[in-house]
Every structure is written in C-alpha cells, then in structure tokens.
Regions:
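Short, well-formed alpha-helical segments that are part of the catalytic scaffolds
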Residues: 8-22
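Acidic helix N-cap motif at the loop->helix transition within catalytic regions
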Residues: 10-14, 37-46
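Short beta-strand/loop segment that forms part of the nucleotide-sugar
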Residues: 25-35, 56-57, 86
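Residues at the starts of beta-strands that form the adenosine-phosphate
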Residues: 27, 52, 191
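A conserved acidic beta->alpha catalytic loop
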Residues: 32-41, 90
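Acceptor/aglycone-binding surface of glycosyltransferases and processive sugar-polymer synthases
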Residues: 54-77, 82, 94-175, 202-219
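Terminal low-complexity segments of carbohydrate-biosynthetic enzymes
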Residues: 95, 105, 160-161, 189, ...
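Catalytic donor-sugar/metal-binding loop of nucleotide-sugar-dependent glycosyltransferases
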Residues: 145-146, 169-173, 182-199
Length: 239
C-alpha cells in the first residue's frame, strides 16, 4: 500500500495502523516528499517497530504523481504483485481495502469509486464535490471512458498492469495523474472494475488541492481528448 505524504505528521501514524489492522499481511510504503513537519521521521519510527512498514524518502515536494511513480518503481523492484494507492489523510477508508483486493482477483485494476451506486462522500464541501463530479464527467466525455470516477485515487493495481501502462511517459500530477492512469488502462484493454467506497473529508491538516492542479488537469485532459480523436481519424494508435 503506497501512501504519499507531505506534511501529514498528524495523520500518518493512524492511517498506517488502520491499514495494518484491515489487512494484517499488507506492507505499507510511506513515500514522503521531505515534509517540513517531520512526517518522514514519524514514518521512520513506525518502520523501526514494524517490519511491514517501509519509508521512501524523496528529496522534495514534486507532486502526487511523481510520488506514486516512485512508489510503483519501489514496489516492482521489491517483487510485489499488487500495488495500492491510498491517501494519507484518512479520506480513503483502509477498512474498505479488503473489498478492493477481492475485486482485483477478477480484474487488472480495481478502482474505488464515489460515483457508482453504493459509493458516497461524507462531510465534503459542496464546491469540492462539484469539481470532482464535473472533472470526472468532463474527462469521461472527452476521452470516451466508461469509468465513472476517473479522478479517484483509491486503487489497487496488478503490478503487471502498471508495467503495461507506459509509466515512463507519465508526467501528469494531481487529479490528471489519476485520469491519465485510468485512460491508459482502458486504452490498453485492461479489465477495470469500480468498487463503491465512502470518501471522508479530512479532519486534520490542509487539502493539497490548488488552482495549479485544476489548471493542469483541464489542459492535459483536453489535450488527450483532442489527440485521441485525431488519432482515431488518422487510424493511429493512442499514445
């Protein structure tokens, strides 16, 4: 289970404990972007007391996508067959991880979804929900995806699936990083299933959402859509 962190010292201990309780044989990788609040040190202390906890110290804040890509590489190099994305702030419920892993047995990617029947959000500001729903709808329409929650970040991948997504070409971050992986999985013909989840608004710390993340998502998704349509017209394979 890969958990990217930046200034999550107040959250990381609890989220790791919840993961370990929910799936006792799971390993956790905390990928910390040199957090000024000492998140990396807290994670190191957890790792000393639990052989299932590992820490990847990164040189600085490079974004969600870069942290996950580093985590994927680490997981692949260490021989893991399944790699999971999970937020550090408690938005993703570790107690729902067993359902994702069960769904993955019959799929290549199990995606935790807020927008399928049974999925929901709790205590999320209305404007954030509108941005997320709107972003998913815009991405789905422009990219021709059937996945309902393309911006969601609670996902379980088979490692061989990630190996087939051309991760060396991924440069996106934030919202559009998740869209990018979803579209690559669909375009590559992988079997993607959505599992209803409960998404909780964080109680401690500040959201990492920013205007720059939204702007990047808009222009990248639009670019992928235009390129994809042009490739179809010209009979070329999508990148």
């Amino acid at each position: 289970v890969i958990i990217p962190t930046y200034n999550e010292a107040e959250n990381v201990k609890l989220i790791v404990a919840r993961v370990r309780a929910a799936v006792p044989d799971a390993d956790v990788l905390v990928a910390d972007d040199n957090s000024p609040d000492g998140t990396g040190k807290v994670a190191d202390e957890l790792a000393v007391g639990d052989s299932h906890v590992h820490v990847l110290h990164r040189k600085g804040k490079e974004g969600l996508g870069a942290a996950y890509l580093a985590g994927f590489r680490w997981g692949s190099e260490h021989g893991y067959g399944v790699l999971v994305e999970m937020d550090a702030d408690g938005s993703h419920q570790p107690e729902e991880l067993p359902r994702l892993l069960t769904a993955l047995k019959g799929a290549d990617l199990a995606l935790g979804s807020r927008w399928v029947p049974g999925g929901r959000v709790v205590n999320w500001p209305r404007h954030r929900e509108m941005i997320s729903r709107g972003g998913s709808l815009y991405s789905r329409m422009l990219l021709g995806l059937s996945v309902r929650d393309v911006t969601g970040g609670y996902r379980a991948f088979r490692t061989e699936t990630l190996d087939g997504l051309g991760l060396d070409e991924v440069a996106s971050q934030g919202y559009c990083f998740q869209v990018d992986l979803a579209r690559r999985a669909v375009e590559a013909g992988y079997h993607v299933v959505e599992v209803p989840i409960t998404f909780m608004e964080r109680e401690i710390g500040d959201s990492k959402m920013s205007r720059d993340i939204l702007v990047e998502a808009l222009w990248r998704v639009t670019g992928w859509g235009i390129t994809g349509r042009a490739n179809k017209v010209l009979g070329r394979k999508a990148p």
